[in-house]
C-alpha cells in the first residue's frame, strides 16, 4: 500500500520541512508552522508591495512604515513635498488661489445712492445697441422727429418720402387724414392737377361695390393711367426711361389718392 500511495510520491517532490528555533517562541508568543509550499515561494522571490506570506506581515509593515515619509514623523520630510516616481524632482504643493469678488458687498442705502459702475456700462451698451438696431431699419431724421407712434408702435413711423401722406394707414380716419386736409386742386398737393381724375360727377351717381370702391372708380383708374397729358406738358417730358417710370408711378399714386378721397368722403357721410 505504501508504494502505491499517490500522496507519498507527490510529497517526495517537495523539499523537507524547514526547522525553526523554538527559543523564539516566548518572544513572539506563538508557534510557527511553515508549509513546504510557503518555503518554495520564499526562495528567490522578487520583492513586491504585496505580501504573499501571511506570517511575515509584521516585518513587511515595519519596513514599509520606515520608508513612508508621511507615517514616519522622525524622518524630517515636509508633508507638503511630494516625491515623483523617478525621484528626479520635488514638487511642492502650493496653496490654492483665492479669488476675491470684484464688487464688495454694499449696504442697500449705499447701493441705491452709488450704483456699481458695471451696471452703468451695461445700460450704456443696451442704449447703444438699441440705437444701432433703430438705424438698421432705415429710419431717417424725419422718422426720428415724428413722435406720434401711430402706426409702428414703439418703433416710430416710417415716412415714405413725399408720398407718405398717400399711405393707406394714415388715411383710415377722415379727422386725421392728410389727404382730406387739402383739396385735390390745392397748392399743397404734391401731384400735378392733370394726373387727378376730373369726372367726379359720374362717380357720385354710380353704385358702390362691396369693397367700397365704385364701378366708375376702376374705369377712372384705367382712364387716368391711359390719359395723355396736355400738349404743353408733352414738350416737358423726355423720352428717357427714368422719366417714363416716374410718370407711371405718379399716375398710380394719383389713382390711389382718388380712391382714398372717395372712401373718406363716404365714411364722413355715414358718420353724419
From Swiss-Prot:
GO BP terms, alphabetized: clathrin-dependent endocytosis
Name of one Pfam family that matches: Pal1
Record field: compositional bias (Low complexity): 215-233
Protein keywords: Cytoplasm, Nucleus
InterPro entries given in the database record: Pal1 (IPR013226)
Domain of life per record: Eukaryota
Gene Ontology CC annotations of this record: cell division site; cell tip; cytoplasm; cytosol; nucleus
Comp. bias (Polar residues): 235-248
Protein location: Cytoplasm; Nucleus
Chain spans, region Disordered: 193-250
Primary site of residence: cytoplasm
Tagged with keyword Electron transport: no
Record family assignment: Belongs to the pal1 family.
Matching PANTHER family: PROTEIN PAL1 (PTHR28307:SF2)
Protein known as: Uncharacterized protein C6B1.03c
Amino acid at each position: 500500500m505504501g508504494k502505491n500511495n499517490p500522496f507519498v510520491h507527490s510529497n517526495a517532490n517537495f523539499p523537507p520541512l524547514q526547522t525553526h528555533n523554538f527559543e523564539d517562541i516566548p518572544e513572539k508568543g506563538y508557534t510557527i508552522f511553515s508549509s513546504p509550499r510557503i518555503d518554495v515561494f520564499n526562495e528567490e522571490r522578487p520583492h513586491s508591495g504585496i505580501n504573499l506570506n501571511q506570517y511575515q506581515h509584521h516585518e513587511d509593515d515595519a519596513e514599509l512604515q520606515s520608508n513612508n515619509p508621511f507615517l514616519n514623523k522622525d524622518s524630517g520630510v515636509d508633508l507638503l513635498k511630494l516625491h515623483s516616481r523617478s525621484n528626479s524632482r520635488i514638487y511642492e504643493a502650493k496653496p490654492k488661489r483665492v479669488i476675491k469678488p470684484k464688487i464688495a458687498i454694499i449696504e442697500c442705502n449705499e447701493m441705491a445712492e452709488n450704483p456699481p459702475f458695471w451696471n452703468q456700462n451695461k445700460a450704456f451698451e443696451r442704449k447703444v445697441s438699441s440705437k444701432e438696431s433703430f438705424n438698421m431699419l432705415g429710419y431717417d431724421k424725419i422718422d426720428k422727429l415724428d413722435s406720434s407712434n401711430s402706426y409702428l408702435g414703439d418703433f416710430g413711423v416710417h415716412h415714405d418720402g413725399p408720398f407718405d401722406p398717400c399711405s393707406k394707414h394714415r388715411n383710415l380716419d377722415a379727422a386725421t387724414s392728410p389727404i382730406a386736409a387739402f383739396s385735390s386742386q390745392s397748392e399743397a398737393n404734391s401731384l400735378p392737377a392733370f394726373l387727378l381724375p376730373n369726372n367726379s360727377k359720374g362717380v357720385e351717381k354710380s353704385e358702390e361695390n362691396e369693397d367700397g370702391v365704385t364701378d366708375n372708380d376702376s374705369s377712372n383708374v384705367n382712364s387716368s393711367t391711359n390719359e395723355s397729358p396736355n400738349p404743353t406738358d408733352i414738350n416737358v417730358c423726355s423720352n428717357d426711361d427714368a422719366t417714363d417710370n416716374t410718370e407711371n408711378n405718379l399716375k398710380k399714386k394719383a389713382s390711389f389718392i382718388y380712391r382714398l378721397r372717395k372712401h373718406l368722403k363716404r365714411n364722413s357721410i355715414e358718420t353724419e
